[in-house]
Every structure is written in C-alpha cells, then in structure tokens.
C-alpha cells in the first residue's frame, strides 16, 4: 500500500520506491530505500512528516504515493 494510507504512529518497511528515475534518486538520497523502516509522525492534507534513518523528513502527497510499504 502507498505510504499515504499509513496512519500516524505506524511503523512500516519500505517494499518499493516508484516513479521516474529522478524522483526515485531524490527519495533514495533522503533514505527511502527498499528495506528501510519508516514511521509516520504526522499527516496533514496528504502531506507527511516521517521518521526515517533517525531523521524527520517532510514529503508531499505525490512523493508519499510513490513509496510502497
């Protein structure tokens, strides 16, 4: 399921990162790689703040939809 469907506080493992090559590379540089653990901190209007690799990252709804957990 896409990251946008995850509720706040849930911990999930990333199964796949989709999108164009440029988008995938951008997300990988932020730490969104297959097998990484991601926790949703908060979600407002589809935009999310997530915890990944001991960092908090804000991503928009379009980016979050490309991350499959």
What role is predicted for each listed range?
Residues 1-69:
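Compact, glycine-rich, soluble single-domain proteins
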């Amino acid at each position: 399921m896409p990251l946008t469907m995850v509720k706040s506080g849930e911990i999930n493992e990333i199964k796949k990162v989709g999108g164009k090559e440029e988008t995938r590379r951008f997300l990988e540089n932020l730490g969104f790689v297959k097998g990484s653990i991601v926790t949703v901190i908060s979600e407002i209007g589809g935009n999310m703040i997530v915890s990944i690799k001991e960092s908090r990252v804000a991503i928009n709804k379009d980016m979050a939809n490309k991350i499959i957990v």
